[in-house]
Amino acid sequence: MMKLNLFINANETESYIDIHAPKMNDHVQSIINAVNDLDKSHTLVGYIDKEIHIIHISDVITFQVINKNVTAITRNQKFKLKLRLYELEKQLPQHFIRISKSEIVNKYCIEKLLLEPNGLIRMYLKDAHYTYSSRRYLKSIKERLSI
């Protein structure tokens, strides 16, 4: 059980968070990630033909580069974005994982993993398709998924 103390002081010039813990663990890291994600945007602007759509990041299953365009894929739609993948990666919450040079997946949309004999990871996603990680990102993926 974690204890929480909140101190409201009108004399403070800015809000800040102190974390006291006997050691670094998954709970502490989750708190740090949640606090860091507070400043990140929760929506993106996507395009379908000439229509402009507001996309909630939590609805996105994966971001893929398709024909040199970054595409946000949700359960029902594919939206073109005007961002580069590396720009998008900086804006996304911690639960989005870069799995290759051309794809970022939502960790919460991964249904199962299959370790292939060649060392790659096949990821089955909620929209009933699968994708592969690249070897270059394998170590990072395993760390982020705790496998």
Curated annotation (Swiss-Prot):
This is Uncharacterized HTH-type transcriptional regulator SAB2242. Keywords: Cytoplasm, DNA-binding, Transcription, Transcription regulation. GO terms for cellular component: cytoplasm. PROSITE patterns: HTH_LYTTR (PS50930). Residues 44-147 form the HTH LytTR-type domain. It comes from the Bacteria. The keyword Cytoplasm applies. GO terms for molecular function: DNA binding; phosphorelay response regulator activity. It comes from Staphylococcus aureus (strain bovine RF122 / ET3-1). It holds the Pfam family LytTR.
